[in-house]
Amino acid sequence: MKSLRAKFLSLGMALVLALSASGCAITTPAVVGSIGGVEIPAGIYLLAQYNAYSSAASAADLATGETADDVKAVLNAQCTGTIGDEEVTTDGADYVARLTLRSLQHYAAVETLFDELGGTLSDAATSEAADQAESVWSSSGDLYAANGIGKDSLEAYLLNAAKATELLQLFYGENGQTPVTDEEYIDYLENECLYLDMVQLPLFDSSTYAFADEEQSQTIESLAEECAATLNEWATAEQGRSERFTSLYEAAMEYVPRAGEALGATMESAQALNYAGTQLMTPDDLVTYGDALTDAVAENGRNVWFTYNMGTAIGVLCAVDPLDAADLDSYKQSDLLTTMKQDELDQTLYEEGAALEQNLDESAMQVYKAANIKRTV
């Protein structure tokens, strides 16, 4: 009698021969279905899932010794975070699935609306996507390949992102469906943003990586108060932005080296110019300061220099009218439209994607389940 092992070997060989004879082959699905009229290639699905896993790993409550590379641990861990407008607490596997679906719906909505609105990508945008894919592949290609993601999928994903950028113009640009008006730009600049002139007196010695101690901090705070008083005095004689810049840089060359000296560092006057400048702070910038910075500006008003602790420096700041600092056309030519409308566009895309007919293949997605993710190669 044949051994049990021999019987299994014979059975396995018979199966291989049967498959060969019938011309059958075991393959993985090239697509995982569609959303709306947009086919979802396996590579796009796997890339969306891998990105979703990275987010889940950051949100996971892992046990001591477990890391983001422990795929099984992350998928079983409790994850808490925000998905869309919803605060979610669920296991890692469900968290990954939800984020993956949301990403694919966004992808499909971009493709759908871009075609409906007659969008086209410039040669420069197409080339940039190809170059970015090549760059990412050269550094992380082995890891992507181990996860079933090809360079062509990376490029397709980046082209989709380029289309999303173009949709911003197709929706809200000068010739878009609902163009942003000059009045809307002005209202946003005046009421949602801050334009700050600033000199920063460092509380951190970049050569030694040492922060100021209490005594040094007090010295630098006193220097900042003196700098603000000096700039307020000079402001009475200023006749415009060019004079303001002269005052700004003269103050930096005077007070920044003195702050460096208080830290025990030597700083040339020319280096001090790196600590002076101007910035339009959008809501995304201001959120990092909470209400403290906007409250300080409200208390002091515009065109008055005041001091503000920025963490790594004492800022000597002055809020000015954004339209005194630059004309409206300059802001339009910058990335202001993105800061104004990107969140609104993304919300529209997520809603449009969720409203499309969902025809994803559960069996295909099971082939590419998150448990197969590899974090190292």
Regions found by a protein language model. Give the residues of each.
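Charge-rich, solvent-exposed alpha-helical interaction surfaces
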Residues: D70, V74, L99, L223-E226, ...
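C-terminal motif of bacterial Sec signal peptides marking the signal peptidase cleavage site
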Residues: L19-G23
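Peptidyl-prolyl cis-trans isomerase
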Residues: E226-T288
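PPIase-associated folding chaperone regions across multiple families
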Residues: I26-T28, Y144-E225, L280-V377
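N-terminal targeting/tethering segments
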Residues: I26-I149
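Alpha-helical transmembrane segments of polytopic integral membrane proteins
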Residues: A18, Y107-E111, A164
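Bacterial N-terminal signal peptides that target proteins for export
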Residues: K2-L11
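Cross-family detector of peptidyl-prolyl cis-trans isomerase
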Residues: I26-T27, G36-A42, F245, Y249-Y255, ...
